[in-house]
C-alpha cells in the first residue's frame, strides 16, 4: 500500500470518528482526478426506483470553498474481494458510500446497464429495497473497497 493510499485511509478514518468525511481541495486525489479528466468529478448513486428496480445516476461533486461535505457516516470498513468474484442480484445491506481503492468492478443495474468502477470511484449505494444490483470484480487484481455506512438510514 502506498503512502498516499495510507494517508487517504487515515483521513477517512478520522472523518468516521468525527461523524463526517471531508475532502480538502488541493489534495493529490482531487488534483489528479480533475487534471486527468478535464471535466467535473462525479459519484455514482444507486437507488431503488418506483418500479422496484435499481437504477443509477451520476451526481456532480462540487467543492465550494475547496471542501465537499458528504453525508454523516457512522464508521468505516475495508472489504476485500478476489478477482472474478461475483455477487449476483443483491440489495445494499445499508445506505453507504463505497469507495474503490484497489482493483476494478462492474456494477449491473436495471435494464442491463453496466457501470465500470476503478480506483478512486465513489458510489453512494442506497438500493436497500427491491431487486438490487450485481457486483462483479473484473481484471486480474483483487478489489479493495472502503465502505462508509451513513448515519441516516431512512433515506429522507
Label for each model-derived stretch:
Residues 8-27:
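Bacterial N-terminal signal peptides
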Residues 111-129:
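Short acidic-glycine-tyrosine-enriched beta hairpin
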Amino acid at each position: 500500500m502506498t503512502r498516499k493510499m495510507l494517508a487517504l485511509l487515515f483521513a477517512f478514518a478520522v472523518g468516521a470518528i468525527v461523524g463526517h468525511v471531508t475532502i480538502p481541495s488541493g489534495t493529490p486525489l482531487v488534483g489528479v482526478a480533475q487534471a486527468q479528466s478535464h471535466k467535473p468529478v462525479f459519484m455514482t448513486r444507486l437507488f431503488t426506483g418506483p418500479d422496484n428496480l435499481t437504477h443509477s445516476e451520476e451526481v456532480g461533486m462540487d467543492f465550494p470553498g475547496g471542501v465537499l461535505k458528504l453525508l454523516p457516516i457512522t464508521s468505516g470498513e475495508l472489504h476485500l474481494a478476489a478477482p472474478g468474484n461475483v455477487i449476483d442480484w443483491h440489495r445494499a445491506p445499508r445506505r453507504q458510500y463505497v469507495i474503490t481503492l484497489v482493483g476494478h468492478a462492474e456494477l449491473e443495474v436495471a435494464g442491463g446497464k453496466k457501470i465500470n468502477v476503478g480506483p478512486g470511484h465513489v458510489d453512494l449505494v442506497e438500493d436497500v429495497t427491491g431487486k438490487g444490483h450485481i457486483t462483479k470484480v473484473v481484471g486480474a487484481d483483487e478489489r479493495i473497497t472502503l465502505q462508509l455506512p451513513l448515519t441516516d438510514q431512512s433515506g429522507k
